[in-house]
């Protein structure tokens, strides 16, 4: 589709835990891929830094890991939202969350990322209702006739 602008969303999910095994690493890469696929199916452009930067930086080499984290934070600055996937927040994710807060980037915590219904986009591909969607004087006790 020509001329359609998609919202750029940064996907934060664990790459490695406290103890990294090859099995956990592969599982986390697979999950990040699934999260991006689901997010893209909702009409956003999803970016997970650990899917991209691990193609040429080795996360087990400290200097290369730091370079990948630095580049990820630089990419986060260009994103419109940060989606934090799951309940397990890694050290890298904590840095991403702190950076997004400092920049004023909206952060959405998707506690159950395996179920697309919990993603912060409605079924009709529009953003979920936010403060701007509320009715004027919505603190009134009587809403009759105002909708």
Model-flagged regions — what are they?
Residues 1-147:
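Conserved catalytic or regulatory cores that recognize and/or transform ribose-phosphate-containing ligands
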